[in-house]
Amino acid sequence: MICIPIIDNTVEKALISAKEALKYGDIVEFRLDLLDNLTKFDIEKFAKIPSIITIRANWEGGAWKESNNKRIEFLKHAIKHGAKFIDVELKEEKNLELVTYRNEIGSKTKIIVSYHDFEKTPEINELIDVVEKELKIGDIAKFATFSNSKKDVLKILEVMNKYPGDIIAIGMGESGKLTRILGLRFGSILTFASMKGKSSAPGQIDVTKLKEILNLIE
């Protein structure tokens, strides 16, 4: 599965971008923390589209400036209205509250629990510890760490390979591009690619180019 991040700053632009992106990818990620004047009604629109709903906290590299309680309520609203996936941080104290709410209302939303390190890739045992903690909370574990070397790439791929079908793992940065290309073969449920000029993280590959590469190595 190829996921294309939507990083526009208005609801109208985001919906237009998503329609275009789904011509190339299988799913989109709505970065709702980047939007101006987000409402629950807007979330209902986004939840109807095959997507990951992400409202990234500012303490995890995101742009959310309002209260955390409002952020959690918006994520619950996405669950209530049938979003395919939501993404919540491992460090978010209320992540289990979202899982409990999902279970109570019988929603089919899958919950991705995520971890980010924008400077380095931790050692394998640390990454495994992160993934195990995430899987005790949600349905899918995700980590995105900055890859500074080929060794970091190998660490990421090795951990991916231990959790096929239950993980999304990404090496950010130039050397991490290999994880975006090989991730699907090593067990990641999806890989991220960008529309031209709209990257949400360092090292993201243009979706057209990524599809060409994936076709070559199939």
Swiss-Prot record:
Keyword Cell membrane assigned: no
Class in the EC hierarchy, top level: lyase
Catalyzed chemical reaction(s): 3-dehydroquinate = 3-dehydroshikimate + H2O
Pathway(s) where this gene product acts: Metabolic intermediate biosynthesis; chorismate biosynthesis; chorismate from D-erythrose 4-phosphate and phosphoenolpyruvate: step 3/7
Positions that bind 3-dehydroquinate: 29-31, 56, 180, 200, 204
InterPro entries: 3-dehydroquinate_DH_AS (IPR018508), Aldolase_TIM (IPR013785), DHquinase_I (IPR001381), Type-I_3-dehydroquinase (IPR050146)
Active-site residues, Swiss-Prot/TrEMBL: 116 (proton donor/acceptor), 142 (schiff-base intermediate with substrate)
Source organism superkingdom: Archaea
Keyword Signal (UniProt): no
Gene Ontology molecular function: 3-dehydroquinate dehydratase activity
Pfam families the UniProt entry points to: DHquinase_I
E.C. no: 4.2.1.10
GO biological process entries: 3,4-dihydroxybenzoate biosynthetic process; amino acid biosynthetic process; aromatic amino acid family biosynthetic process; chorismate biosynthetic process
Subunit annotation: Homodimer.
Function: Involved in the third step of the chorismate pathway, which leads to the biosynthesis of aromatic amino acids. Catalyzes the cis-dehydration of 3-dehydroquinate (DHQ) and introduces the first double bond of the aromatic ring to yield 3-dehydroshikimate.
Family according to the record: Belongs to the type-I 3-dehydroquinase family.
HAMAP family referenced in this protein's UniProt entry, alphabetically: AroD
Protein name, UniProt field: 3-dehydroquinate dehydratase
Native organism taxonomy: Archaea, Methanobacteriati, Methanobacteriota, Methanomada group, Methanococci
Protein encoded by which gene: aroD
